[in-house]
């Protein structure tokens, strides 16, 4: 058994992979958004010289719950659901189609990095253009709240208000602030994620080949949880600094703010050291496993329900 591959029928079959990807995105936000809110607040306030410093992710989460309730943890979720549904649909669909194209007539004798990596990076590059504006809105909504340092006159009433005000103040290019950091994060992150996922999935299924546990929804779900979760941890461990830079760039209200992610990280390192470049590591890693596990389980289950055969 080689790397995971999909086989669809004629007609609507081509689009089924994109539908399955959309379901993966919805599952990701439902499970992971509260952790993401904590991560963004830590990245915004714990890297600012004059920022409110939270002791850790748990302290940040407790402050949000005390001042805003559970609703505060899902601040900005509307744009996340919309963005992630579309983004995941594109990511999983493009990744699957790119693999089919690059594999061609090559023998299916195991995962091939020369197929997985470019397929994942290509998908990551495409979705970065979708993610950049939606994540800018999400991040700006997330840093607001009772416990925020954002002045009241700079706050937004809704995701739509945030998008409109951003375009009004900064022009159309303003909504794509942080595009370079998003591109770096998505290309690198997806290459790491799918490489770990494919190799783990291949080796686990290889060991179960002659086992009675080979088939079954619970077995497939368990493998999906493990491979997706570990892939998510590997991905975010590799790209968190790019994500920190993206958050700083996107949440700044100043037009003249530095937008080169490497220069932003250099500045953060001077102020807060390596720890500053990994601000939000705790909630990010805690979120990475369940959120990405949910994405893979939802993706694989949806494909099975849609009649997409996977080897």
UniProtKB/Swiss-Prot annotation:
Optimum pH is 7.0-9.0. GO terms for cellular component: mitochondrial inner membrane. The chain crosses the membrane at residues 18-38, 76-96, 113-133, 178-197, 222-242, 288-308. It is a multi-pass membrane protein. InterPro entries: Mitochondrial_Carrier, Mitochondrial_sb/sol_carrier, Mt_carrier_dom_sf. Solcar repeats lie at residues 12-101, 111-203, 219-305. It is found in: Mitochondrion inner membrane. Inhibited by mercuric chloride. The keyword Lyase does not apply. High expression in flowers and siliques. Lower expression in leaves and stems. GO terms for molecular function: L-histidine transmembrane transporter activity; L-lysine transmembrane transporter activity. Pfam families: Mito_carr. Its main location: mitochondrion. Keywords: Membrane, Mitochondrion, Mitochondrion inner membrane, Repeat, Transmembrane, Transmembrane helix, Transport. Belongs to the mitochondrial carrier (TC 2.A.29) family. Mitochondrial arginine transporter that catalyzes the counter-exchange of arginine with lysine, ornithine, arginine and histidine. Substrate preference in reconstituted proteoliposomes is arginine > lysine > ornithine > histidine. May be involved in the delivery of arginine, released from seed reserves, to mitochondrial arginase and the export of ornithine. This is Mitochondrial arginine transporter BAC1. It comes from Arabidopsis thaliana (Mouse-ear cress).
């Amino acid at each position: 058994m080689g790397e995971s591959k999909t086989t669809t029928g004629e007609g609507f079959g081509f689009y089924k992979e994109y539908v399955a990807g959309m379901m993966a995105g919805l599952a990701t936000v439902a499970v992971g958004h509260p952790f993401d809110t904590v991560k963004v607040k830590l990245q915004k306030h714990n890297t600012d010289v004059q920022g409110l410093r939270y002791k850790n992710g748990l302290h940040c989460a407790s402050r949000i719950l005390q001042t805003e309730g559970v609703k505060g943890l899902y601040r900005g979720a509307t744009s996340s659901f919309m963005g992630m549904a579309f983004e995941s649909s594109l990511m999983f669909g493009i990744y699957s189609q790119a693999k089919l194209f690059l594999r061609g007539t090559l023998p299916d004798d195991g995962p091939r990095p020369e197929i997985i990596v470019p397929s994942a990076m290509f998908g990551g590059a495409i979705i970065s253009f979708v993610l950049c504006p939606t994540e800018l809105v999400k991040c700006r909504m997330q840093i607001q709240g009772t416990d925020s340092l954002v002045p009241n006159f700079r706050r937004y009433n809704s995701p739509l208000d945030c998008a409109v005000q951003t375009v009004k103040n900064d022009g159309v290019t303003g909504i794509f602030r942080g595009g370079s950091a998003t591109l770096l994060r998505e290309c690198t992150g997806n290459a790491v994620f799918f490489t770990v996922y494919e190799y783990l999935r291949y080796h686990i299924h290889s060991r179960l080949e002659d086992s009675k546990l080979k088939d079954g929804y619970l077995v497939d779900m368990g493998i999906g949880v493990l491979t997706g979760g570990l892939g998510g941890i590997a991905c975010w461990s590799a790209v968190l600094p790019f994500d920190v830079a993206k958050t700083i760039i996107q949440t700044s209200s100043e037009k003249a703010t530095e937008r080169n992610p490497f220069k932003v990280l250099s500045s953060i390192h001077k102020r807060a050291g390596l720890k500053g470049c990994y601000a939000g590591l705790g909630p990010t890693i805690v979120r990475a496993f369940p959120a990405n596990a949910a994405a893979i389980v939802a993706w694989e289950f949806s494909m099975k329900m849609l009649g997409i055969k996977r080897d």
